[in-house]
Amino acid sequence: MTDILIDDTATEAVRTLIRAFPLVPVSQPPEQGSYLLAEHDTVSLRLVGEKSNVIVDFTSGAAQYRRTKGGGELIAKAVNHTAHPTVWDATAGLGRDSFVLASLGLTVTAFEQHPAVACLLSDGIRRALLNPETQDTAARINLHFGNAAEQMPALVKTQGKPDIVYLDPMYPERRKSAAVKKEMAYFHRLVGEAQDEVILLHTARQTAKKRVVVKRPRLGEHLAGQAPAYQYTGKSTRFDVYLPYGADKG
């Protein structure tokens, strides 16, 4: 489990939020590795020996740009957003794609199994709900803490199947490439091994009514070695589309 250092300045809202996740409260930072820091009105991810940190902020910077420009993105075409599908994001991570999808007016159920990442994302959604510019978008995201492959079958029984299951599995870290930003390096170190790709894709194809959309690097291998029905390809990213079991490609 991940350590969390709760500063005296942490608000009651932050203290309440972190109690929802299995984190280990500590009185000082660990000697090495990563930990969460709760201070003021924010939860951040820290790496011992580094000055920078990672927070989930949907109200500014790159997240704001993607939110306001999301309608023209390839992801919008991949999920056929004009049909207003319901989307389950089975690998939510830091929530960037979930937020873009929600900014398109879609209802998104997001799953994240790592407690520290889920805490960071939950905190980002909480703060986005307080901002007039992002509150409507944030309200369309429903975060579930846990393993999507385990939770989706049970959720189908109570809510029915979603139109789309969206997958963005963690790519192998490109250690020699400058393209790996420090934030993602923190993320890789925190999360470690990715979910079982075969089980994840299999469950997604059992769950979706219309399609499974998988985000990959443009030249990356197919998820679980399985070829998709078709693709949407951009300059650096592509979206592989798989049909649900029993669906007719035509």
From Swiss-Prot:
Q: Which Pfam families match?
A: SAM_MT (PF04445)
UniProt KW keywords: Cytoplasm, Methyltransferase, rRNA processing, S-adenosyl-L-methionine, Transferase
User: Where, per UniProt, does this protein localize?
Assistant: Cytoplasm
* GO CC field: cytoplasm
Which InterPro entries would you find in this protein's record?
16SrRNA_methylTrfase_J, SAM-dependent_MTases_sf
Class of the enzyme per the UniProt entry, highest EC level? transferase
Q: What is its EC number?
A: 2.1.1.242
**GO molecular function, one example?**
rRNA (guanine-N2-)-methyltransferase activity
Give the catalytic activity.
guanosine(1516) in 16S rRNA + S-adenosyl-L-methionine = N(2)-methylguanosine(1516) in 16S rRNA + S-adenosyl-L-homocysteine + H(+)
Is-annotated flag, keyword S-adenosyl-L-methionine? yes
Q: Where does S-adenosyl-L-methionine bind?
A: R96, D97, D168
Instruction: List each coiled-coil range.
Output: none
Q: Per its database record, what is this protein's job?
A: Specifically methylates the guanosine in position 1516 of 16S rRNA.
Family per record: Belongs to the methyltransferase superfamily. RsmJ family.
Classification via PANTHER family: RIBOSOMAL RNA SMALL SUBUNIT METHYLTRANSFERASE J (PTHR36112:SF1)
Write the protein's name. Answer: Ribosomal RNA small subunit methyltransferase J
Q: Which organism is it from?
A: Neisseria gonorrhoeae (strain NCCP11945)
Originating gene: rsmJ
